[in-house]
Structure formats: structure tokens, C-alpha cells
Amino acid sequence: PKINVAAEALSQIYLGAEEFPHIVLDNFLDPTMINAAAIDAKWLVNNLETESWRFGATDDHDSQLYKRGIPNIDDMPPAMQLVCLYMNSEPFLEFLRKMSGIEDLMADPTLDGGGFHVTYPGGSLNIHHDFNYKDDLAPERVYRKINLLLYLNEEWDTNWGGNLELWKKDLSAPFKVIELIQNRAVLFNIEGAPHGHPHPLNCSTGENRRSLAFYYYSATPPSNQLYDRAMWLKNGELV
């Protein structure tokens, strides 16, 4: 993307952001690349065999409603595969390292928990803190540091909801609400970074919220607790 020439300048914005390091980048990838991936995303929702999804049916626990995912790159069409391969490539990792200051940042080629995500009408993702370590990505335990979310909806009516909310560390309220715009990327350090889209989607039947998610790791442990699963906001605390 165009941002490759500006890692140092973006680093000041990223590291100096309110509450925790984060940045929103529009026009992130080449338009031809993102348009092809967006077409792939629409095709996947309607054509992929059920057993290829991370959830055999839409997940229906009360913190993650009507959401499905495809973490296996082999189950994705070619244009989406190309995006995933680029996001895990050494040139892109070098950009992330410069922007974040995390020198040993590594990708997860298995896309564990990430990859293609779709949420259907009525669906939501409660405010949560992500799982933050893996034992099977490297010889030693590694720790999740950065999330990158890339939106694939060609047209999204703001009245449908689904905006990403970044919350204050004290869990009192969101401090930033980010609209779904195709080719918009949201990057943030996950430590002390509650987030989600907690309000049910109000989109019409046949519409859905589509995105790609990528997670990046380091050998440096976090200063907060270790979580082997997502921790969900319940009654003012993460459980």
C-alpha cells in the first residue's frame, strides 16, 4: 500500500494515539486488489461449504452473535488469498515493525481466530479483550501484539450499524467509533484495548458485515494478564 513510504510519520500518530496505540488508514490497498477481494467476500458468503467455516453454523452465544469465519487460506478465493499473503509478507511486516516499534513482530500464517469474518443481520460482537498468546506458532510461546482489521463492504449504510468501537481501558465508554468503509484498515495494539461492535446489525436481509482480520505476535510478554480466550465485558468487567 501507499503507506509503505510513511512508516516513521505514521509511527508518531500510532504510538501517540489516545488510550492505546491505534490508527485508521483509508485507501489502504490498491483499488484493484481490494475490489477483487470484496467480490470474493460476497461470493464466499453464499457459496462456501458449511464445513469450511470456523463455526458450522452462525455462532450464537450472547457475546458473539450471528458471526462466522474462515481462517484457512486454502478455503478462500484467489484475490482474498493474495491479500492474506501480502499481509503476512516480510515487506509488510517490516512496515508494521517500523510503525509500531516492535522489532520482532511476526505474522500468523494459520490466521488463528482471524481471516475472513462475516456478521449477519441482528449480529453483534460484544466488547472484549482478545486472547493474547499462542504456543504453536514458534518454538517458544509468543504474544499477540497487533490487530489489523480490513473492511470489505462495497457500500454500507451507516444506519445499519456495525461500527467498530474502541473503548477506554477503564471500560466506561467508547472513545472512538469507526465506520465501515471499504479499504479502510484499523490497526491497534491489543494490550489494554477493549473493542467490538456491540449493537445488533440493522442491515437488510442479504446484507452482512464483511472484513479480514490479521493478528501479529512478538516474543515479549504483555504487562497485563495472559488470556487463552477472549474476555467479554459483563456488568462492567471482563470475564
PLM segments and residue spans:
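Fe(II)/2-oxoglutarate
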Residues: 1-18, 229-239
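A structural signal for the main folded, soluble domain(s) of proteins
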Residues: 49, 57-70, 99-108, 112, ...
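Catalytic core of Fe(II)/2-oxoglutarate
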Residues: 122, 130-144, 153-239
